[in-house]
Amino acid sequence: MRQEKDSLGIVEVPEDKLYGAQTMRSRNFFSWGPELMPYEVIRALVWIKKCAAQANQDLGFLDSKHCDMIVAAADEILEGGFEEHFPLKVWQTGSGTQSNMNVNEVIANLAIRHHGGVLGSKDPIHPNDHVNKSQSSNDVFPTAMHIAAVISLKNKLIPALDHMIRVLDAKVEEFRHDVKIGRTHLMDAVPMTLGQEFSGYSSQLRHCLESIAFSLAHLYELAIGATAVGTGLNVPEGFVEKIIHYLRKETDEPFIPASNYFSALSCHDALVDAHGSLATLACALTKIATDLSFLGSGPRCGLGELFFPENEPGSSIMPGKVNPTQCEALQMVCAQVLGNNQTVIIGGSRGNFELNVMKPVIIYNFLQSVDLLSEGMRAFSEFFVKGLKVNKARLQDNINNSLMLVTALAPVLGYDKCSKAALKAFHESISLKEACLALGYLSEKEFDRLVVPENMVGNH
């Protein structure tokens, strides 16, 4: 162990770790739970430190030597392999200050080590005076939250969602001529095609994609430059424009300064809104997974309209059983995301005066939702949807047995006669055609001309 000193006194820190006294204090006092600060947030914080150093150098507030040391250390961390030096939990101060200082300390100590200094000496790089220059945890951490959210959405979720839409579109085309019985209220309805049913799923997800893409606009707004309460105290003129320039260059994302710094610190409506779009996606995916589970139920004693891909044995006691496991896994993912949404909403509501103090739990749940949905959609698309096949014989049997084909006769016979024919067929367990013939409503030839399921599916 080595000894480091902060404003409260001496702290012992593991000799081989790059973090310092403030990180160690957080480890000592906030050690519960397995949930670490997401590394996406750590990467975003490192980007901010690198870009802040460059901005401060450009403005003459940091000399080139110190800037180069900070940039070199940041780049090395961004290359990977430093995860063990960022051990802090989500459950810490609500401003994220401890994680901000964790990053400051690691960058400073890495730079010190590279230049032959003593870890924890703060010489020649000081974690506050140099690495955190022109910044406050109160504006740095929300900036990191937005950067992490944008990059996760664009690199993970949006590609996975787009992929699932394309997989569903392929099934729309594959199933376009497979006529089946539609269902409303879980009961038999009029005919449609399986392709039409899948087009509804694809449309749902397209709307979700549009909503998520729209939510990015406010996530591009960054709080950096607000410092402690939004007034920009201790921020040199021109700093915001400079650091935003470097962040855009570093991330290749169109970040802009927040339109209002006071709201940027005190609330996280942009993340609440964006996660609301993720919750909508979870609702849509739950509906789709549930429908497909039921459509393939059986295989002999259920609906049985779809054949599931045989990925793994479904039961430890019943041989030969194949279950909709991907559907169930995705439904659990969606349940978690909907729970996360409530946490994000509650967290967003805790903006006490000038600072929201639930920042870590908001971004933790947001990023978990992105990861779960992204991975869940890819697995569901690849291992389930792509392998779905139609049970054409079952579709035809259902059509032949459906009483709702009587709807096609309503313009000819009227509602009352059609109801009587359908009820007669149901109560006597005969076909609709047999009921119409027995009642003398139509001849067999007339019935066959009027009741053609393929002509009842429309052009949608």
UniProtKB/Swiss-Prot annotation:
Annotated site (Important for catalytic activity): 328
Pfam families: FumaraseC_C, Lyase_1
Principal EC category: lyase
An annotated GO cellular component: cytoplasm
Domain of life of the source: Bacteria
Signal peptide stretch: none
Positions that bind substrate: 95-97, 126-129, 136-138, 184, 316, 321-323
Compartments where located: Cytoplasm
Biological process (GO), any one: tricarboxylic acid cycle
SUPFAM superfamilies named in the record: L-aspartase-like (SSF48557)
This protein's pathway: Carbohydrate metabolism; tricarboxylic acid cycle; (S)-malate from fumarate: step 1/1
Keywords on record: Cytoplasm, Lyase, Tricarboxylic acid cycle
Alphabetized InterPro entries for the sequence: Fum_hydII (IPR005677), Fumarase/histidase_N (IPR024083), Fumarase_C_C (IPR018951), Fumarate_lyase_CS (IPR020557), Fumarate_lyase_fam (IPR000362), Fumarate_lyase_N (IPR022761), L-Aspartase-like (IPR008948)
UniProt function note: Involved in the TCA cycle. Catalyzes the stereospecific interconversion of fumarate to L-malate.
Family: Belongs to the class-II fumarase/aspartase family. Fumarase subfamily.
Protein name: Fumarate hydratase class II
